[in-house]
Amino acid sequence: MAGAVSLLGVVGLLLVSALSGVLGDRANPDLRAHPGNAAHPGSGATEPRRRPPLKDQRERTRAGSLPLGALYTAAVAAFVLYKCLQGKDETAVLHEEASKQQPLQSEQQLAQLTQQLAQTEQHLNNLMAQLDPLFERVTTLAGAQQELLNMKLWTIHELLQDSKPDKDMEASEPGEGSGGESAGGGDKVSETGTFLISPHTEASRPLPEDFCLKEDEEEIGDSQAWEEPTNWSTETWNLATSWEVGRGLRRRCSQAVAKGPSHSLGWEGGTTAEGRLKQSLFS
């Protein structure tokens, strides 16, 4: 601003000097051209006025044109300076307006962001409203499946408990038959009069019926300890499967017991045949 004021002062001085020169040159051109006529005004009034020569007119026009050019240049310089100062003022005003517009723009951006957040919240609420019935259906289906599994396991447990008395009866019947046959074999040997094979050795050998009876007792204890779990998990399911595997093994054992009397008869027949051979040799 100080530089602009100094330039304006210089331009003002140039304008004043140019104006003073122009006004001084044009004030009295006749006196400058003929200075001697001023001393004799009376004679000049009677004589006719003479025209100045052409050279003087040309010099006068040149002298008048020079101050006009200076005035023109000074005016142009002043206009340029004015525009420059006006441009600086405009830039300052623009900066001020920009500084004022920045908070307005930030406020507008915040308002837009809040609107976007509100829209996203609405979308999320709509999605949750659509997903809630799906979650409810899934939970109901899972509960129904769990109830079905519990019912199936409960029915399996009841069937196993119902089948245990039948197994006990089957296990007791083969035991009685083998006992009677063994008693008959003892009588046959006693009729010969020689006891080459003692009855203690036969009694000391464990029969498969004893194994099956022990396993049945263990199964009864397991069934008493086994209770229906309210909530089935993977661990209880694994226990149930291992228990079913043991049940299959016990069933095979009971089948072997059902076939046992024939094997026991063959074994007793073999022992009686060996006794007869030894008796014939000693006799």
Swiss-Prot record:
Record's compositionally biased regions (Basic and acidic residues): 47-62
Membrane topology classification: Single-pass membrane protein
Alphabetized UniProt keyword annotations: Coiled coil, Membrane, Signal, Transmembrane, Transmembrane helix
InterPro entries attached to this UniProt entry: CCDC107
Keyword Membrane found: yes
GO cellular component assignments: membrane
Segments for region (Disordered): 30-62, 164-207, 258-283
Residue ranges the record marks as coiled coil: 104-134
Localization of this protein: Membrane
The keyword Transmembrane helix belongs to this UniProt entry's keyword annotation: yes
Signal peptide: 1-24
Origin: domain of life: Eukaryota
Gly residues bias spans: 176-187
Record field: transmembrane: 65-85
PANTHER family per record: COILED-COIL DOMAIN-CONTAINING PROTEIN 107 (PTHR37345:SF1)
Name recorded for this polypeptide: Coiled-coil domain-containing protein 107
Species, as recorded: Homo sapiens
